[in-house]
């Protein structure tokens, strides 16, 4: 008896996450693209087979998801975006990886030394564009990133962030104004010069009958040397004695523990763009942004797609504030405005075999429901324009020197 054909269901096809070593990015392969056949899986972007399936061993409680309605829209947008990219033959522009600084990971059994320190220093999350939300990056891929010099890059970015905004400062906080003003002024005498001949900040020799400021640890400094120093850090330049610092004004009844995070995109033609944000611990739950990229309908460079948006979700998937401005209330909106920082910087990857590299530009993230700091955005754009001017000026001088040699 001939078998009756089964009617295809209308359920959403299952996706699998893969890491493409050719594209150096996460990709989603749909079940109807031949993933059920062994050895037939290929990257949907480069059609290469050098890919590895990512087995997510994390529990469902640690997954960071977005609401189901948003997932359906993201899945449909993702499939349409893949079709458009295949027709145009254009390589996708963005590949977001969420990086959090200062992870509170627990030391695993048998783990010690630098391995434990590096694992707790940063937390990695990724979104393959399938609409499943942010998930922890597998250990195998994290080791590849950290082993390729990625850790040094993150450390440099963290230092820049701490010095620029003071957020997530890993060193000493500034001394309080009252502590600085209370430092006694002493007149330098021969006995002072005998015990301490020069200022440790400017290294200039003290002159008798001049005025200096004395720390509680009895070390002397010029007034115009130690005051700027203590306004940045509260420790003595010589013995690291610490003065009282200002209380943390950002701490409130909710006890929000902010941590600096970064979002990294690959740019077309080489290079990376890095956006910074704050993540927080609220009620014991990590709050992370969902960054809508070109994959799921928030593309950059396409005027009809509108501006980029950032949505914040709790670890259980509760939407804090969506891209259309509908949030959980004015209280959470106020906290978001305090946390989100619109400063974005651009890094260019240097390629020694190329005579010229692609020009860089800063990418600014915007949101309908968040008040971004216009002054910070202007400062970032000015810095980017300065970099571009230096780049084109250097190329013009190189061309002029080459033409003079030929003539």
Curated annotation (Swiss-Prot):
EC code(s) of this entry: 2.3.2.27
Domain of life: Eukaryota
Catalysed conversion reaction: S-ubiquitinyl-[E2 ubiquitin-conjugating enzyme]-L-cysteine + [acceptor protein]-L-lysine = [E2 ubiquitin-conjugating enzyme]-L-cysteine + N(6)-ubiquitinyl-[acceptor protein]-L-lysine
Location within or outside the cell: Cytoplasm, Cytosol
GO biological process: abscisic acid-activated signaling pathway; protein autoubiquitination; response to abscisic acid; response to water deprivation
Record's note on what induces expression: Induced by abscisic acid (ABA), and drought and salt stresses.
Null allele phenotype: No visible phenotype under normal growth conditions, but mutant plants have decreased sensitivity to abscisic acid (ABA) and reduced tolerance to drought stress.
GO molecular function, one term: ubiquitin protein ligase activity
Pfam families in alphabetical order: DUF1117 (PF06547), zf-RING_2 (PF13639), Zn_ribbon_19 (PF14369)
Gene3D superfamilies reported for this sequence: Zinc/RING finger domain, C3HC4 (zinc finger)
Pathway stated in the Swiss-Prot or TrEMBL entry: Protein modification; protein ubiquitination
Stored InterPro entries: DUF1117, RNF126-like_zinc-ribbon, Znf_RING, Znf_RING/FYVE/PHD
KW Cytoplasm (keyword) present: yes
Broad class of enzyme this protein falls into: transferase
UniProt-annotated stretches for the region Disordered: 316-337
Role, per record: E3 ubiquitin-protein ligase involved in the positive regulation of abscisic acid-dependent drought stress responses. Possesses E3 ubiquitin ligase activity in vitro.
Protein name stated in the entry: E3 ubiquitin-protein ligase RDUF2
Natural source organism: Arabidopsis thaliana (Mouse-ear cress)
